Swiss-Prot record:
Coiled coil: none annotated. F-type ATPases have 2 components, F(1) - the catalytic core - and F(0) - the membrane proton channel. F(1) has five subunits: alpha(3), beta(3), gamma(1), delta(1), epsilon(1). F(0) has three main subunits: a(1), b(2) and c(10-14). The alpha and beta chains form an alternating ring which encloses part of the gamma chain. F(1) is attached to F(0) by a central stalk formed by the gamma and epsilon chains, while a peripheral stalk is formed by the delta and b chains. It comes from the Bacteria. GO terms for molecular function: proton-transporting ATP synthase activity, rotational mechanism. One of its GO terms (cellular component) is plasma membrane. The keyword Phosphoprotein does not apply. Its main location: membrane. It comes from Helicobacter hepaticus (strain ATCC 51449 / 3B1). This is ATP synthase subunit delta.
Amino acid sequence: MFNIISKKYTQALVDSGSNLDETLSILKGLSLALKDKRNADIIASPFLSKTQKEQFLLESVGKVDMKLQNFFRLLAQSDRILLIPYISDELERRLLARKKEYAATLTAKESLDTKTLEKIQDSLAKKLGVKLSIKQRLSEVDGIKLSVEDLGIEVSFSKERFSNDLKHHILKAL
């Protein structure tokens, strides 16, 4: 739900003609600030008026151009300040897509060393003909999964599934 709404706000930012790289850095800073429980509680507080939340937000970003100020005012008046991390992520995806750069997520049970990550990154980037950066995420699942969400690519290998398929194939052969 938040992703759908954030895409509309992101499109408004893209259409506004503002410096998108600068806007992205401001949004990332706000996203980090909103991860702090105290700041998120202030924004979500029913005891503060929308005007007070707007002032808090505008003071947090400092001096920005008028279009961006109006954007933040709109977010505050619409009670959408907590969408800023989603807007930031969507804007980052769009900017990377313009540059033919994509972010991939590698999910594994154990952390892989940087050399292995670079090999995977280089070979996949070469195959797809794009720039690629891999972020690693740890999981409890015994296997490995690589996904490039923006390109609709997902490759996974599960130890349990492999084992089950092997057993099934052996039983079928007998």
